[in-house]
Amino acid sequence: MTETTTKKRWYVLQAFSGFEGRVATTLREYIKLHQMEDQFGEVLVPTEEVVENVAGKRRKSERKFFPGYVLVQMEMNDETWHLVRSVPRVMGFIGGTADKPAPISQREADRILNRLQESSEKPRHRKEFQPGEEVRVTEGPFADFNGTVEEVDYEKGRLKVSVSIFGRATPVELEFSQVEKTN
């Protein structure tokens, strides 16, 4: 670890699962404490906002899309390496060797950052349905009927389900909260 890179690159840290937020906060505090802000950029726990329907009410929550990992933008040198490794609950860097971690590619970093941006603009639904999937209607006039998903509209949180009524397939529009997956 004798090379000094002058450009900040993105590295992935493995943290104890469930402690990603605490690791990110502690790392930011260590960076300030050791006055190394010029050698570090962002410290991120990649999360996305998801919307779920609970008892007919829409509720937003955050979900980590890389559980157990923290992204760090930094210049890699002996001091920054030791600072990161000294943070409690950090198991190490992902990629490269223990002494010389490898950064993720700029393309990978851009993909993750774009996903973070999209999530903040438009929350995803926790329930994900696919056309052709079998569901059971749980509420409304078609309760206890089984059907096949034909269309999914995540913007409105609605599905078009083909329900068999008296032997005929009938398309029915339902909200995500009115159905559950059968398998």
Swiss-Prot record:
Keywords: Transcription, Transcription antitermination, Transcription regulation, Transcription termination. Transmembrane segments: none annotated. InterPro entries: KOW, NGN, NGN-like_dom, NGN_dom_sf, NusG-like, Rib_uL2_dom2, Transcrpt_antiterm_NusG, Transcrpt_antiterm_NusG_bac_CS. One of its GO terms (cellular component) is cytosol. One of its GO terms (biological process) is regulation of DNA-templated transcription elongation. Pfam families: KOW, NusG. Gene3D superfamilies: 2.30.30.30, NusG, N-terminal domain (3.30.70.940). It comes from the Bacteria. Residues 131-161 form the KOW domain. PROSITE patterns: NUSG. Signal peptide: none annotated. Belongs to the NusG family. Participates in transcription elongation, termination and antitermination. This is Transcription termination/antitermination protein NusG.
